[in-house]
Amino acid sequence: MPRPPAKTSLAAFAAFAALGLSACGDSHTKVTTGTYAGESGKNAPYLDVGPLSYEVQLSRELNPVNTEDSTYLQALTPAQRTLAPGQEWFAVFIQVYNHGSQPLPAASNLTITDTQGNTYLPIEPGEGNQYAYRATLVPGNGQLPLPNSVAYDGPTQGALLLFKIQVVSLDNRPLTLKIVDPTDPSETASAELDV
């Protein structure tokens, strides 16, 4: 004769649920390092730098004769536009989130470093480049790029950090993006970039 199904007590179920939820981790854990996971950005970490969170959407080489890529190279001065022998364009597209209610300054100190210690600073295009990352105030409960902006609605949905890097640095991977908090330089985060 079959046994009637056992009744699970509410207390046992609650204990089991609590155990399962405890495995999820603390959603407020500060993340300061990560690895960008590829073109989808699907597994890209949110990097906490001071009170703001940064996420790499995409990182890749740019081809100036490609139609899409040429738009990222708009509003450069002649000196900025010139690549030295052995250099190429490299782009990192990021989003910045402010979960607080007050506007906060976005980082202005962002660099890329290869495994040989070569460090690259971003080039800031002129105002005519609507994709360029600008270290402006991030609105309270807002983000950069701003919703409904060209960069936000663009193919990468991120603001452009534009670099001139040595081609040899692509052999000295991983490349690491470092972000420094503008209000407290001791607060930093870094992410390994996909190439």
Predicted regions and their residues:
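Sec-dependent bacterial lipoprotein signal peptides
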Residues: 1-22
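Conserved functional micro-motifs across diverse proteins
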Residues: 24-195
